[in-house]
């Protein structure tokens, strides 16, 4: 049985999954409780194994962390990651497809949640009111729409080469999932960026732009991501931005990408995305 835990300020829950032949045994609930369980049957063992991988990929994407059987990392959990841009083909792996989870509607209430009711006022705490502006520069004035989205298209394009030195990227401290994401992002550096890229990949490119370029003002980047990809996509990018940090050895053009449990300092300039 493989166990996964999700924890944030509001919840602490588990998900466990195990394949037994052509069956998938699943359990979930709050940590410390028995939770609920379900058995799904498939046509054969291969189909069950594929479904297990999809379920695990979905939960990891949502922030679940697998719990090892002991406190030491398994051999398969470590990968050396000091690479030149040209060496990335050895690390990029096929991503498992994402399967959306469907939930039955809550039968205990037919009421609309108050913050979803039409035309209802949203009341903010006094300590954050000064940041809840419709636009960070001019309250009430919408962000100007760009025609060709130049900041987005050329995102992080100057990172791989600087002063005739090819950048070296070290992301070995990241999890396997993030190592794969970072490798995909680096492979896209010299191409034109669009919001068809997965949001974690876009987050890495945005982090590289903000941390490893000479120009620190990048407000237009997020405006253009929102314009093309929508607010939900941009929000997902911001969430993933807070999961990584970057250290840059400018003299040697070595870029180290690290996991981060809190919002890194380079996000401070974007504290008012709204």
UniProtKB/Swiss-Prot annotation:
It holds the Pfam family WGR. It comes from the Bacteria. Induction: Repressed by LexA, induced by DNA damage. Residues 2-78 form the WGR domain. InterPro entries: LolB, WGR_dom_sf, WGR_domain, YehF/YfeS-like_WGR. PANTHER family: OUTER MEMBRANE LOLAB LIPOPROTEIN INSERTION APPARATUS, PROTEIN YEHF. Has been implicated in selenate reduction; a mini-Tn10 insertion mutant in 'molR', (which was mapped to 47.3 centisomes i.e. this locus), is defective in the reduction of selenate. This is Protein YehF. It comes from Escherichia coli (strain K12). The gene is yehF.
């Amino acid at each position: 049985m493989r166990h996964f835990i999700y924890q944030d300020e509001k919840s602490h829950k588990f998900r466990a999954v195990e394949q037994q032949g052509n069956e998938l045994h699943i359990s979930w609930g709050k940590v410390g409780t028995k939770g609920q369980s379900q058995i799904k049957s498939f046509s054969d063992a291969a189909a069950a194994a594929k479904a297990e991988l999809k379920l695990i990929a979905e939960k990891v994407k949502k922030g679940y962390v697998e719990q090892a059987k002991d406190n030491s990392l398994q051999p398969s959990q470590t990968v050396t990651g000091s690479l030149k841009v040209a060496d990335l083909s050895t690390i990029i792996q096929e991503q498992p497809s994402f399967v959306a989870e469907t939930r039955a509607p809550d039968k205990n209430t037919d009421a609309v949640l108050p913050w979803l009711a039409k035309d209802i006022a949203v009341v903010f705490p006094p300590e954050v009111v000064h940041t809840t502006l419709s636009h960070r520069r001019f309250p009430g004035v919408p962000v100007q729409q760009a025609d060709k989205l130049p900041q987005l298209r050329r995102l992080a394009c100057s990172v791989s080469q600087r002063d005739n030195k090819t950048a070296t990227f070290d992301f070995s401290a990241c999890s396997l999932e993030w190592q794969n994401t970072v490798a995909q992002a680096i492979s896209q550096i010299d191409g034109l960026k669009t919001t068809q890229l997965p949001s974690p990949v876009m987050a890495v490119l945005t982090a590289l732009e903000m941390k490893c370029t000479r120009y620190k003002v990048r407000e237009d980047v997020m405006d253009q991501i929102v314009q093309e990809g929508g607010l939900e996509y941009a929000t997902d990018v911001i969430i993933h931005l807070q999961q990584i940090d970057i250290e840059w050895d400018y003299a040697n053009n070595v870029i180290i990408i690290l996991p981060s449990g809190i919002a890194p300092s380079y996000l401070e300039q974007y504290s008012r995305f709204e």
